[in-house]
C-alpha cells in the first residue's frame, strides 16, 4: 500500500522578467491543492531574481499560501532557488521554472509514489511528446550509472519532488557562476550521497522550450559543465574514478 504524507509542499519558482507567468503559477498551484490529499497544504514561493521589476507582495489565494521574495540584486537561477528553499516551510520541495507546467494531479501523485525515497520523478512532456521512449527508457536512465556516464536524464527540475532534508549541502553551498548545469549538479550530488529516486509512471509535468533557453547555448553549457566538474572535484563528491567518468561524459556530450 502506498504511503500518504501530510507534510506541506513548497513549490519554489525563480521569477525573472516573468510577471506575466504569475497568474498561471497561482492557478496551477491552486489546482494541485484541490487535487491533493495532504492536509498541510501547498505554499508557492515566488523568488524574484529581477531587481528592476518588483512583484506585488499582497498577492493572495484562498487555498494556498503565497510568499513573495523580492530582490535588490540578480543572483541567478540556482541562488534564487536556494533563497526560496531557505524561506520554505515545506517538508517537500519542487523547483519549478516559471514557464513550465504542473498537471493538477502532480502533488498528489508524486507524494503517493514517494514511499521512503528521497525524490519522486515523474514522466513528462517535452516539445509536445513524451520525453522518455524506447531510445530513452525511463526505468534505465534515472540512475546513478546513467547520470555519471551518459548525461542528465531529467529534462527540468520541476519534474522532481524532493524531500527537503535530502537536498545536498554541496549544492546549496556552491553557487554556480554559469547557469545551465546547476540541476545536473543537484542530481549528481544526490546520487553520490545515496539518494533514492522513486519512479512515477504518471505524466504530470510539461517542459516549455523557448529559442532562448539557456540549455540551448552550447558554449554556455560547456562552461557550466566544466564548472560543475570543478565543484564535484573540489568537494570530493566522487572518487577519482567517478570524476574521470563524469569528465569524459561531459566532453562526449558536447563533442
Task: For each feature predicted by the language model, list its residue ranges.
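Cell-envelope/extracellular polymer assembly enzymes that use nucleotide-activated donors
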Residues: 8-10, 43, 185
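Short, well-formed alpha-helical segments that are part of the catalytic scaffolds
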Residues: 18-33
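Short alpha-helix within the catalytic core of nucleotide-sugar-dependent glycosyltransferases
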Residues: 26-27, 82, 90, 103-115
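Flexible acidic/His/Gly-enriched loops in nucleotide-sugar-dependent glycosyltransferase catalytic domains
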Residues: 33, 63-64, 79, 107-170, ...
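A conserved acidic beta->alpha catalytic loop
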Residues: 45-56, 97
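Glycine-rich, basic loop-to-helix element that forms the pyrophosphate-binding segment
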Residues: 71-88
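Short aromatic/hydrophobic "clamp" motif used to bind/position activated sugar donors
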Residues: 93
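Conserved nucleotide-sugar donor-binding catalytic segment
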Residues: 143-221
